[in-house]
Structure formats: structure tokens, C-alpha cells
A protein has these predicted regions:
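Protein-protein interaction and targeting regions used for scaffolding, dimerization, and localization
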Residues: 184, 188-293
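Cytosolic regulatory regions of ion transport systems
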Residues: 1-235
Length: 293
């Protein structure tokens, strides 16, 4: 079931264990961004695709940010499935479908994520060649279910392993119990304020829109701690909401039509009505309060 996205499962009582989704979710929680970065993702199988998709939704720290994601691997089919990737401004996605790169190019990146294969030896080979060829100063993250073996080869300072089997199993438990529960509470708050469909009757797209928002809360918490005002957090939350819809190929239209994937709120934050802005601000405040309970 690894190729079946959780977001395609309509039954709210069924959860699919996805290594790739868990891995991506846990990676960005463990190694969050603190400022705009130039990021290399080497390898673009399931893990790499999810690293990008989750990164686009949680790496929102400033309305004026500029992240650049360089994808080294064939993204042809991915772009066919996700036709609105050009709507991720102010961030940018650059595809290198051949998967090839000059080692010297890697010196310009702020982080390198190697996730091309589930094979430990393949990813280790890539990492070893990079470290041998150029004096990379940025963090190099290596996807491997056996992090202890890689650490013994390279030492703790040069390679940061993620995606260990033990960590992912633990992350899945946390996701089921905490993230889904937080998403449900968030939706219930919205329903109490504005009305709507009960959680159990939501389709998978809307249910996972709440999950995406709940995933973003760890980023929002860090921004709150730094004194980011609620209005800015609301704008970032709106950017996340738009990205979630664009990832699923929605477009803007004057009149919302869910069946045709058209929504009237797919506009920059400053173009929203004051009523819609208030909804975003109240949602941020409610989630902040929820985290203190």
C-alpha cells in the first residue's frame, strides 16, 4: 500500500501506513528551516517526492521568503500529476530530470537531502562520492533505515541520517493519535464558529486539509516564540492553504465549485475579504490555545 496516499482513503477509520509520508513529515519536524534556503533533493522516488510536498506546506516562515528546491531526478510524471507547481511563489522549484549534477554546484546549497533509494548502499555511495569530491559545508541528510551503520562509516559530524525504521514506526503512532486529533479539534472549532460538515462526514481532501494545517503548527509555534504577529501567521497559514489546494490541482474562480476544483479564495492574502482574514487569524489563535491544553 506504499503507493496509496493516505489522502485517497475516504474512510476516516482506516489509516494507511506510508513510509514515504511518515519519513517526510518527521524529517521536516526534526530538521526545520529557520531562514530561506537553497535545497538540493537528490533522488526523486516516493521519499523525495514527499520531502518536497511536505516541505512546500510547512516551510512557510515569512511572506517575503524565497526557498529554492532543486530536484535531481526524473520529475516528468510528478509534474503531470501536479500541474500547479508554478503557483508556489515566492518559492521556486527547479527540476533536473537527468538527475546529474556537477559536484561543484553542491557547494552553493544550504542543505543536501539524499533520498534516491531505499538501498543503504546506493545512498551511501552518493554521499561518499560527494564528500570525496568537494568540501561541502552545509548539512548532508541521508535517507537510510539503518542509520547506525552509516554513522559508523562516516562519523556523526559529516552525515545526518533520517528515516530509520524505529523512528518512522514511532512517528506513525504520533501521527495517528496526535496529528489527526489536532486536525479534528481544529475542524470542530471552525464548525462551531461558522458551521459546516461534521468531521466523520468530511471527504478525504477536506480532512487532510486540516491535517496539513495541523502539521504546519510546529512551524507556527516557532514563529510565535519569535514574536511573529498573528496577522503575519494568518497570511502564512493562507499561503499553506493555497499550496495544499494547488498541489491537488485546484484553480481560482469567482465562484467556488468543489467538483471542478475551483475556489474563490485562491488569491493572495491581501485580496481576501476582511471576513476571510478574520477566519485565518481566529484559526491561528485557536490552534495556539489548543497547544497549551
Amino acid at each position: 500500500l506504499e503507493d496509496i496516499s493516505r489522502q485517497n482513503i475516504e474512510n476516516p477509520l482506516i489509516t494507511v501506513f506510508s513510509i514515504a509520508e511518515n519519513c517526510a513529515r518527521q524529517y521536516w519536524k526534526d530538521y526545520p528551516v529557520l531562514q530561506s534556503e537553497k535545497i538540493a533533493i537528490i533522488g526523486f522516488e516516493n521519499v523525495g517526492k514527499n520531502i518536497l510536498l511536505y516541505g512546500l506546506q510547512v516551510n512557510l516562515i515569512d511572506p517575503g521568503q524565497h526557498f529554492t528546491y532543486h530536484i535531481y531526478g526524473d520529475g516528468t510524471e510528478f509534474r503531470r500529476e501536479h500541474t500547479r507547481l508554478d503557483q508556489m511563489a515566492p518559492d521556486e522549484i527547479v527540476f533536473h530530470d537527468s538527475g546529474s549534477y556537477e559536484y561543484a554546484e553542491l557547494l552553493d546549497f544550504d542543505r543536501i537531502i539524499i533520498c534516491g533509494s531505499e538501498s543503504v548502499s546506493s545512498n551511501v555511495t552518493i554521499a561518499g562520492r560527494i564528500l570525496a569530491a568537494v568540501p561541502v559545508a552545509c548539512p548532508v541528510y541521508l535517507y537510510t533505515p539503518r542509520g547506525d551503520i552509516v554513522t559508523s562509516l562516516f562519523g556523526k559530524g559529516q552525515i545526518i541520517c533520517f528515516g530509520t525504521a524505529e523512528k518512522l514506526a514511532s512517528a506513525d503512532v504520533v501521527f495517528n493519535e496526535r496529528t489527526m486529533e489536532a486536525a479534528r479539534r481544529q475542524h470542530e472549532f471552525y464548525c462551531q464558529q461558522y458551521g459546516g460538515t461534521p468531521w466523520e462526514q468530511l471527504d478525504s481532501f477536506k480532512r487532510y486539509s486540516n491535517v496539513s494545517s495541523s502539521d504546519y503548527m510546529s512551524t507556527a509555534e516557532r514563529l510565535m516564540a519569535r514574536g511573529t504577529p498573528p496577522e503575519t501567521l494568518a497570511e502564512l497559514e493562507h499561503m499553506r492553504w493555497c499550496r495544499y489546494h494547488y498541489i491537488h490541482n485546484w484553480t481560482y474562480g469567482v465562484k467556488t465549485d468543489s467538483a471542478r476544483r475551483i475556489h474563490s479564495c485562491l488569491v493572495p492574502y491581501h485580496q481576501l475579504s476582511e471576513e476571510e482574514k478574520v477566519k485565518d487569524i481566529e484559526a491561528i489563535k485557536s490552534r495556539a490555545q489548543d497547544q497549551t491544553l
